[in-house]
Swiss-Prot record:
Attaches a formyl group to the free amino group of methionyl-tRNA(fMet). The formyl group appears to play a dual role in the initiator identity of N-formylmethionyl-tRNA by promoting its recognition by IF2 and preventing the misappropriation of this tRNA by the elongation apparatus. It catalyses: L-methionyl-tRNA(fMet) + (6R)-10-formyltetrahydrofolate = N-formyl-L-methionyl-tRNA(fMet) + (6S)-5,6,7,8-tetrahydrofolate + H(+). (6S)-5,6,7,8-tetrahydrofolate binds at residues 110-113. Disulfide bonds: none annotated. Pfam families: Formyl_trans_C (PF02911), Formyl_trans_N (PF00551). Its EC number is 2.1.2.9. PANTHER family: METHIONYL-TRNA FORMYLTRANSFERASE, METHIONYL-TRNA FORMYLTRANSFERASE, MITOCHONDRIAL. NCBIfam families: fmt. It is an enzyme of class 2 (transferase). This is Methionyl-tRNA formyltransferase. The keyword Protease does not apply.
Amino acid sequence: MRIIFMGSPEFSVVALSSILNNTEHKIVGVYTRVPKPAGRGKVLTKTPIHTVAEMHGLTVYTPKSLKRIEEQDRIKELNPDVIVVVAYGLIIPKEVLSIPKYGCINIHPSLLPRWRGAAPIHYAILHGDSQTGVTIMQMNEGWDEGDILLQKKLSIDEQDNIETLSSKLSNLGGAMLVEVLNNIDNLVPVAQNEDNATYTNKIEDFHIDINETAEVACRRIRALYPRAFVFFNGKRLRILQASYYYDDNISSLKPSSILNSGMHIKCKGNTILVPLVVQMEGKTLCSIKDFVCGYNVKDYSIT
């Protein structure tokens, strides 16, 4: 088949590589987001997909929108049998959805219809889900509402953070994509159950709420790794790894109380958050053991 691939972040790379390495299909074009300034030097930086595509000699397109007639005509000229979309970042208009013989298929890292939207992996961790998975669906004009072509489950380990779980789901999605492309004529699309639909939003708040339980705080640290933080005496302190426990003898203490020199933090109820790896703003990351050597932490406040 002739395939157009649309993707941008690191999560998309395994899917593109799986087509290149494990199928006989031909990629006739790769669409990705335009290069953007990044880092302190604001150097114009290509997306991971852009870099990988060029390494394989593939033609790369970086339109700012697919709504323009000129862009749609170019896709028609490429004559794809199918368009594969993996975290592309642009809206696919109905005019593009209808171009390929097999339409547009999308790899979505959740067990649809659970966790539609922009942050399904984050939400699975935040909500304490014991499992998630990958859904490959036939795209329509809705928000992750297309019929399911293939779906597989994946257990979430208690220590998984957004990086480790994303990697596992990316690998699973790549293998599933090969299966779908090689059997596309034999697949029977299954409609999603709208009664079970849940939705996610882009996450912009990375603050850890100490007034929640320590278990919820730990989920937040894992889901927002490595950006979750508390304020330590007014300065941002990132917590990159933590554990928690219960203590029935601390019910009289208010949340945010620092219990000992190891910086165990009282949270909601009788739960205690134990930071393990931290990073003070402007400093390098370190173990909590090294961090507390520089502070008498019980004299400081956590918010």
